[in-house]
């Protein structure tokens, strides 16, 4: 009988190989998930994606539990318990500065697969395929009760011109723009463990990129993929193979999880 563990998996570059546009779940990763379930472990996706964009992965891979929105959204047994928004006043200040300095922007005021932008410039600059962009002339962030994410079109280095960014969490996944979104997966993991009545030492986390760094500082088992960034590998307890080279399966086998 295996000790019950609480396993938290990043999606892109961890469970899913092949990059954003050609992503696939390796057969060995699917097999590992099946064996982990049969061993009685608690499985949970842990992603920076919004719940609306990640829920299809959750169903596709047979998960019932998910931390979304960079640690601020929690789904247990298929039910979304809630999503904590960004501090609205700080987002408004960011948007105003971007307007003054000529940076195109978009916001996500609800849990959906669509961002709103005041004009077509954001899409023209980014040619983004990550999510839909709907143009809403006269868009004003003050008109919305909550804002979950924001997006600024800027190339690497240009973000240094935007002082209000210092007050908000942000990440860059694409050359053309940055995401202003929560980036504290550790926060979500601790919330889930608390709900489950589990200890921090019962958790095992799997990740590969910058937005996984927050979950690599706590006293639980930390697994970095072979394709992970160097900073993550330095914090890991175990470094496995690349996502496309059976990294998930090999790590679970090595850690005697099944």
Region spans (language model):
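Hydrophobic "anchor" residues on beta-strands that sit immediately upstream
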Residues: 6, 65, 198, 204, ...
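Short, well-ordered alpha-helical microsegments
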Residues: 51-55, 158-159, 212-213, 232
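Active-site phosphate-binding/coordination module
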Residues: 24-122
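Conserved acidic, metal-coordinating active-site core of Asp-based
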Residues: 97, 101-104, 108-218, 227
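Asp-based, Mg2+/Mn2+-dependent phosphohydrolase catalytic module
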Residues: 218, 222-223, 228-258
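Short hydrophobic/aromatic-enriched beta-strand-loop microsegments
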Residues: 63-71, 127, 171-172, 222-226, ...
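Short, structured coil segments at secondary-structure junctions
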Residues: 61-62, 70, 164-167, 218-219, ...
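Asp-based phosphoryl-transfer active-site loop
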Residues: 3-21, 45, 216
